[in-house]
């Protein structure tokens, strides 16, 4: 799906054959986070060994919220009742792995709190692991969630869900910018989106960096108008002469004010 206002495209392990669910095991090298409250950021701010570009900003740190999301000195930090995004009343900026009223172990915990949150970073990625964190028991029922949010040095981010039990249709999942005006909602209250052994991923495609792919048309233009039932040919040329061996990806974005945008994935393997 996509793009949104940040030029983010997304896909899931159920929709994209090349996106395989792969849990990143950090159990033997992770650091546990401490939370003063079950609706706040952890006491520790995570330093990143890379600059993470998100919408129109760059960050070298990360804040982790007990309610299933990560952000950066975000507004509305203590909001526990999730809702639709983008919205200025929801936490922002933020990436919502599983934003719900969660209840991990914390300094203000009650008898029902359970589960811990860990992290591990290296030069390529940061992994935030919610390890069997429970849901605050309310009318919608209980749940226990084992998932991780992963941020990569190239600006990509993904969420891996290993085991999600109990109530799984009350969370907000997606991301939004610092104003709460742009973003993508993958799921919200009343919708079922995640399952066990499931992954979704979001990333941008910068045409300036894709030197191996060139688009042309019969008249040389890539813009114009088509009437109903009309068609036009767009030609894609791939040049591999300056590429090293490996896999490359791109997307051809087709947008219109009168129709939903379409992204055509392009995958190249150089051997």
Q: Predicted regions span which residues?
A:
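Extracytoplasmic Ser/Thr/Pro-rich, glycosylation-prone low-complexity segments
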Residues: 1-211
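Short capping micro-motif at the N-terminus of alpha-helices
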Residues: 61-65, 234, 264
């Amino acid at each position: 799906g996509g793009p949104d206002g940040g030029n983010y495209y997304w896909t899931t392990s159920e929709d994209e054959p090349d996106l395989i669910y792969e849990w990143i095991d950090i159990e033997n090298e992770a650091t546990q986070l401490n939370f003063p409250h079950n609706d706040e950021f952890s006491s520790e701010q995570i330093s990143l060994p890379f600059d993470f570009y998100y919408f129109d900003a760059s960050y070298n740190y990360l804040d982790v919220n007990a309610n299933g999301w990560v952000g950066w000195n975000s507004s509305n930090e203590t909001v526990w009742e999730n809702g639709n995004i983008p919205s200025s009343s929801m936490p922002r900026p933020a990436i919502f792995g599983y934003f719900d009223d969660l209840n991990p172990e914390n300094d203000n915990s009650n008898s029902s709190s359970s589960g811990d949150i860990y992290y591990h970073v290296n030069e390529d990625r940061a992994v935030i692991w919610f390890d069997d964190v429970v849901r605050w028991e309310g009318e919608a029922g209980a749940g226990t969630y084992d998932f991780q949010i992963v941020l990569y040095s190239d600006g990509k981010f993904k969420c891996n869900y290993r085991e999600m039990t109990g109530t799984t249709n009350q969370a907000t999942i997606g991301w939004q910018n610092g104003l709460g005006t742009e973003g993508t909602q993958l799921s919200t209250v009343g919708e079922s989106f995640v399952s066990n052994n499931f992954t979704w991923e979001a990333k941008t495609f910068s045409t300036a960096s894709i030197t191996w792919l060139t688009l042309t048309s019969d008249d040389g233009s890539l813009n114009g108008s088509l009437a109903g039932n009309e068609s036009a040919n767009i030609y894609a040329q791939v040049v591999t002469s300056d590429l090293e061996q490996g896999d490359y990806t791109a997307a051809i974005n087709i947008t219109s004010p009168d129709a939903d945008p379409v992204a055509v994935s392009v995958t190249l393997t150089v051997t």
